[in-house]
């Protein structure tokens, strides 16, 4: 078996590593660097440049020099974050026919995975040059909070680059592997704070060592898939543009060439301010007007930069609290804090993280290389070169289906260890229903419409039967890459439908955070809604069973009783259409009171007919065996 290489496909920089014996080794690219800028350029003469060569020519070719493509991968063009990038990126972001965010390069439409594949090809070539043999397999890292669409798109990029992606691994988890593999750490709980070029993750990970085997178990994860160093750069660029406009009266935003020079200068200044208290942004001949050439010379202090980005740093703190809460831990339970991603070199970030955890982050983990090293370790685990390592990752949000009453019924709860598989039996809502719609949801709210829709499919060909009798088994299966597969099977007919969730749009961080915040803020209203739906379902069941008993009783039921029952049934039916739980319960009680004679007749029939008895008990027991949360009938118009 050949080597499985580990690739950190980053927003700003990428890195490749391999297992060399028992040690992971980060490889230098053709330019002699251990990291490669995730920049791709398409030149006028048709050449494709990747990495440093692409970065060097960006000033003269801004429209066709693509960077931070990871922020677009697996996203919809109409996403708020994408629209924000449309207005600030020098290259052209367009909407594809399927609604995804694509790019227009010299009149050619290109998908983000297609462009990211160029970076992966360079990583592949770097490994092949070092090993002297072809490389066909890789472990690629993604932010822990990447959703299905983004993970799928990353795998697609690997395939386009000629790589079989053996595993998608979360970046903080990879960093934990890099940190914990060669250390005698014993049993420890660590927090991995990963602030990269375009994404932010926090993972709480427990490392256990038993008889020489190390288990890396992710307890909880949280984050923001649209927060990173690029946002810090943008704040500084906007400040410099505004200062220049105040001084010279010229808005550089209308000059792509000037903006590209400014981007490079801002990134350089930001890096310098991590070690210096102030720096000069000096750009001669940045632009010109009728009076002649204009030069930029602006002094920027560390304090100024910190004031520009303070809210971005603070945005990363809230997910830390949620992750700890989900893990059931407090800050005092964390033994070590690991910083990953280039943006964590900023002193303000280090200070805020240290203040939150009450301890200094460790300095013995290289923030640029740890993720690629961890990916290589995982590759070694898959080939068998690395032994006695077990990695247990989690899914970041609950997954379930929409059931009767518009309820989200979870099959897999958030922070469940993956891979995992869970099945549950549901039934039909109406007599002789021949099809159901399986509507797959992701989120934390009780009301189905408050969650993110991942897709839906129909299961047809259900044999005619009374409501509640068919048994439909729904199975959710999340693989080790965090990708969801859903199946629905009619246990009677054996008919089955399956889908892999390949949503072209996925959850962005703000949507996820909003779901979690809404779930917390609306816990009480969610609880009341859930109780209302349960009462409605009980009332609905009572309605159907009473009508059936009236029909079976026939002439044995006195006319007065029948009239009273019909009246109570109509009153309950009206109450079920409302939102008042107490009113439904009252009407159910009234129906029970006027149905006493009916109950007596039913009991007599029960005693007299053994065959009827068996049928009745099966009918009454159905709700014990089947979850009382049912599908709406599939209408033809769907």
UniProtKB/Swiss-Prot annotation:
Pfam families: HSP70 (PF00012). The keyword Amino-acid biosynthesis does not apply. One of its GO terms (molecular function) is ATP-dependent protein folding chaperone. Keywords: ATP-binding, Chaperone, Nucleotide-binding, Phosphoprotein, Stress response. CDD domains: ASKHA_NBD_HSP70_DnaK-like (cd10234). Residues 604-620 have a biased composition (Low complexity). The modification Phosphothreonine is found at residue 199. PANTHER family: HEAT SHOCK PROTEIN 70KDA. This is Chaperone protein DnaK. It comes from Salmonella choleraesuis (strain SC-B67).
């Amino acid at each position: 078996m050949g080597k499985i290489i580990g690739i950190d496909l980053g927003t700003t920089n990428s890195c490749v590593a391999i297992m060399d014996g028992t040690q992971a080794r980060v490889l230098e690219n053709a330019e002699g660097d251990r990291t490669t800028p995730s920049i791709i350029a398409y030149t006028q003469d048709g050449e494709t440049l990747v990495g440093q060569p692409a970065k060097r020519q960006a000033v003269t070719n801004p429209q066709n020099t693509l960077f931070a493509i990871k922020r677009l991968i697996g996203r919809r063009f109409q996403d708020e974050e994408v629209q924000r990038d449309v207005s600030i990126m020098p290259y052209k972001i367009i909407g594809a026919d399927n609604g995804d965010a694509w790019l227009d390069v010299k009149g050619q439409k290109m998908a983000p995975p297609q462009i990211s594949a160029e970076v992966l090809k360079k990583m592949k070539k770097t490994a092949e040059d070092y090993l002297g043999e072809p490389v066909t397999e890789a472990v690629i890292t993604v932010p822990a909070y990447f959703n299905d669409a983004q993970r799928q798109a990353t795998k697609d990029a690997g395939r386009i680059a000629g790589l079989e992606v053996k595993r998608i691994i979360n970046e903080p988890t990879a960093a934990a592997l890099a940190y914990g593999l060669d250390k005698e750490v014993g049993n420890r709980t660590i927090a991995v704070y990963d602030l990269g070029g375009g994404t932010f993750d926090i993972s709480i990970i427990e490392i256990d060592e038993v008889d020489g085997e190390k288990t890396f178990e992710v307890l909880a994860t949280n984050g923001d898939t649209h927060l990173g160093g690029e946002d810090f750069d943008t704040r500084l660029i906007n400040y410099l543009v505004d200062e220049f406009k105040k001084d010279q009266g010229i808005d550089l935003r209308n000059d792509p060439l000037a903006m590209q020079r400014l981007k490079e200068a801002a990134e350089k200044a930001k890096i310098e301010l991590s070690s210096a208290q102030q720096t000069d942004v000096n750009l001669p001949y940045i632009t010109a007007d009728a009076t002649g050439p204009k030069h930029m010379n602006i002094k920027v202090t560390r304090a100024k930069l910190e004031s520009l980005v303070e809210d971005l740093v603070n945005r990363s703190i809230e997910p830390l609290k949620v992750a700890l809460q989900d893990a059931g831990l407090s800050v005092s339970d964390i033994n070590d804090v690991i910083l990953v991603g280039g943006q964590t070199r900023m002193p303000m970030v280090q200070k805020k993280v240290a203040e939150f955890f009450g301890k200094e982050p460790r300095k013995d983990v290289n923030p640029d290389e740890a993720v690629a090293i961890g990916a290589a370790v995982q590759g070694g685990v898959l080939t068998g070169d690395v032994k006695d390592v077990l990695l247990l990752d989690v899914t970041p949000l609950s997954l379930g289906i929409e059931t009767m009453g518009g309820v989200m019924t979870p099959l897999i709860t958030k922070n469940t260890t993956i891979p995992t598989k869970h099945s549950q039996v549901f039934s039909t809502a109406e007599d002789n229903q021949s099809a159901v719609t399986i509507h797959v949801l992701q989120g934390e709210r009780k009301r189905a419409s408050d969650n993110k829709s991942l897709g839906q499919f129909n299961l047809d060909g259900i044999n005619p039967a009374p409501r509640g009798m068919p048994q439909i088994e729904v199975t959710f299966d999340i693989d080790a890459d965090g990708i969801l597969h859903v199946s629905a099977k009619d246990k009677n007919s054996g008919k089955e439908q399956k889908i892999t969730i390949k949503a072209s749009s996925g959850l962005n961080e703000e949507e996820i955070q909003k779901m979690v915040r809404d779930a917390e803020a609306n816990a009480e209203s969610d609880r009341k809604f859930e109780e209302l739906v349960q009462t409605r379902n009980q009332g609905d069941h009572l309605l159907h069973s009473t009508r059936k008993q009236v029909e079976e009783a026939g002439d044995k039921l006195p006319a007065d009783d029948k009239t009273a029952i019909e009246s109570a049934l109509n009153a309950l039916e009206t109450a079920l259409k409302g939102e008042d739980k107490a009113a439904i319960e009252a009407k159910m009680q009234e129906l029970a009171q006027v149905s006493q004679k009916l109950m007596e007749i039913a009991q007599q029939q029960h005693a007299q007919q053994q065959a009827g008895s068996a049928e009745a008990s099966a009918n009454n027991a159905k709700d014990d065996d089947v979850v009382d949360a049912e599908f709406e009938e599939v209408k033809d118009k769907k």
